[in-house]
């Protein structure tokens, strides 16, 4: 059984990661429908998502570093891989936000989603 603070830290981490990863998956699924509503609808939905997603990304990042500092038997190599995937996901999302071309939007979105899903998978191995 985990200590109460460990449970709280892990809860915050999983909740934040779920918002970041799950939100990308849900928004990706909604884009075709949003495009039918209005050409601007996907952009407006993405902007609304960003107001929730980026704070969640920050919480996941902070609690992930917190985990690294307090978990004694943490596999450092595996944690390093996960951290790199998280950075790839965040960078991809940033590229997707500022990208002007279809290629930048596609590459940024793919990096964000694949990096996030891969980080979640590696996190389960920790």
Where are these regions (language model features)?
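Polytopic transmembrane helical bundles with strong interfacial aromatic enrichment
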Residues: 1-126
């Amino acid at each position: 059984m985990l200590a109460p603070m460990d449970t709280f830290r892990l809860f915050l981490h999983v909740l934040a990661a779920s918002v970041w990863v799950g939100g990308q998956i849900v928004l990706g699924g909604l884009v075709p429908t949003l495009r039918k509503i209005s050409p601007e609808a996907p952009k407006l939905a993405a902007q609304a998502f960003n107001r929730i997603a980026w704070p969640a990304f920050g919480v996941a990042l902070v609690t992930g570093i917190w985990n690294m500092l307090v978990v004694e038997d943490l596999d450092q190599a595996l944690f390093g891989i996960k951290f790199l995937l998280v950075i790839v996901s965040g960078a991809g999302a940033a590229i997707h936000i500022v990208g002007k071309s279809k290629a930048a939007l596609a590459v940024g979105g793919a990096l964000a989603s694949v990096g996030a899903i891969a980080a979640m998978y590696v996190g389960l191995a920790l």
